[in-house]
Amino acid sequence: KIIYDTYESDVAEKGNTARRIGDEYRKAADKIFDSDAFPYESDICFGDIEFVPASYAENHGIPEYAIITNELELDKSYDLKEFGSKAGHLTVYVQSETVTAEKLAEVLLAIKDLFDKNGVTFYVIDCVLEYPKPEDGAQRDDFRMEVKDFLYSDIYEEEMVKRVTDNDEATKAYWQAEDE
């Protein structure tokens, strides 16, 4: 007796193909984050390709740029750079004694540069800049800077601090609304 069959999600909706691409992208991002060239203290850092089955594409919280899994082809060889530039999503938490918009702008510019040098593309980044955790492991919650869905195309020197500040404020408003 079959209780649960995953053929529909894994094969027909191309879930296995999306998982394979996502795993390769995550490995490429991890290689950068785990390297000596990554200059930041971070306990959370990873990369994903945003995929969604067509039946969930309109749900709350699904990014507009997510790739519809049903449109993938089984067993096709895909270009990670192309997928990264369309739907690559980095998540990075950085600990620093300096938590300012200027420092977060510096971090974003450095991460973009490092990923560019390693040929790994991304579309957006979520990045949290926070104080180091104390010895007891408790997180200070008095101040942090955070950008959510910060576009790769918005990471450049000119007026970077303003874009970071604007996104931080929008992100705080987003989380406030989600908590209500």
Language model feature labels by segment:
Residues Y7-D179:
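Metal-dependent nuclease catalytic core centered on acidic motifs
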